[in-house]
Amino acid sequence: MKKTDRKKLEKELDKLWSRAVISRDKACRYSNSTDRLSAHHIRSRRHAITRWNLENGLCLAWSVHFLQKANPELFHDRIIEIIGQKEYNRLKKISDQTYKWSLEELERIKEQLLEAINQNG
């Protein structure tokens, strides 16, 4: 698989991950709104090991997600409020590990994300 093919697969996984998070949560985890939903990575997507892990995502209304840029400290506090400090620390510990996914693993992740989307409708 060429590098461009890998990048295409990663982009596809990003979209599937987002759909899977939104289909799982169905509403903003902070406000319970169903208006203008987006999927948010709790730990940045730059951390490869947790980038497509559904535990590292939650559904937020755009108005809540907007706080990430407007007031990062308040936004971080809200994320902790939603998932709890213990869960945040667990995700942080995992995400701090360096990892390079093989192509076979990326294909397996794709299957898992599609399955999650199908299960949650």
Sequence positions of predicted segments:
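A short glycine-/small-residue-rich loop at the edge of a beta-strand within enzyme catalytic domains
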Residues: 8, 12, 52, 66
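Short Cys/His-centered divalent metal-binding micro-motifs
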Residues: 36, 57-85
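Short cysteine-rich loop/turn motifs with clustered Cys
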Residues: 13-38, 61
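A boundary/linker detector
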Residues: 1-16, 32-33, 90-121
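Positively charged, helix-rich recognition surfaces that bind polyanionic ligands
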Residues: 3, 14-18, 24, 67-77
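Short microdomains enriched in Cys/His and/or Lys/Arg
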Residues: 45-59, 80-93
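Histidine-centered nuclease catalytic patch
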Residues: 29-58, 68
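Short, flexible active-site loops
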Residues: 2-6, 42-45, 61
